[in-house]
């Protein structure tokens, strides 16, 4: 009916819908790490945001996961888990959800990206803190994870020189 289309038109003309995507990257001679960012606003209280990283071995073109880089993945997982917990505790920030440690323990399933100085783990909004706290990022210098890396990991990250 005409009335229905008038209502539809009134409610959609001024609707501020927005989708944005972005890519950033870091690479050395052996590894390429893409970070994909996405923001979507569909009329709610605030936009939804999301970030994901994907890394590639430049010699093979294959994706690289954290498990590919570790001598003992359980030891690496525990070490990084403890380092993230320490950063949270040292920050004094009280906005984290009360059970954030249950999510942080699965950091390996989050967005993990590399640069020349270390590894960054990203927890998207609502993963471990409310939207108002934003995404939570934790940087860990390579010297703290190097003992847990296998030869392949040391090679890709150019820590074998």
What is each of the regions a protein language model found here?
Residues 1, 5, 53-65, 127-129, ...:
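Short N-terminal helix-initiation segments at or just after the protein's N-terminus
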Residues 27-66:
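Contiguous hydrophobic, core-forming segments of folded domains
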Residues 51-101:
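Short helix-loop boundary/capping segments
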Residues 44-47, 74-80, 131-135:
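A short, polar/proline- and glycine-enriched secondary-structure boundary/capping micro-motif
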Residues 1, 5-32, 37-41, 116, ...:
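Active-site acidic/histidine clusters and adjacent loop/turn architecture
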Residues 22-24, 53-55, 109-111:
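Short, surface-exposed charged micro-motifs
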Residues 18-20, 47-52, 107:
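Short, surface-exposed coil-to-beta transition loops
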Residues 81-138, 142:
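Compositionally biased, intrinsically disordered linkers/stalks adjacent to structured regions
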């Amino acid at each position: 009916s005409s009335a229905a289309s008038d209502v539809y038109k009134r409610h959609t003309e001024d609707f501020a819908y927005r989708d944005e995507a972005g890519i950033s990257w870091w690479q050395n001679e052996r590894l390429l790490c893409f970070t994909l960012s996405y923001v979507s606003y569909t009329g709610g209280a605030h936009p939804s945001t999301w970030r994901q990283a994907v890394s590639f071995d430049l010699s093979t073109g294959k994706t690289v996961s954290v498990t590919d880089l570790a001598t003992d993945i359980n030891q690496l997982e525990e070490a990084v888990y403890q380092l993230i917990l320490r950063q949270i505790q040292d920050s004094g920030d009280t906005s984290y959800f009360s059970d954030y440690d249950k999510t942080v323990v699965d950091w390996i399933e989050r967005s993990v990206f590399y640069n020349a100085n270390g590894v960054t783990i990203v927890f998207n909004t609502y993963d471990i803190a409310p939207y108002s706290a934003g995404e939570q990022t934790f940087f860990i210098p390579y010297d703290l994870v190097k003992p847990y890396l296998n030869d392949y990991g040391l090679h890709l990250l150019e820590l074998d020189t």
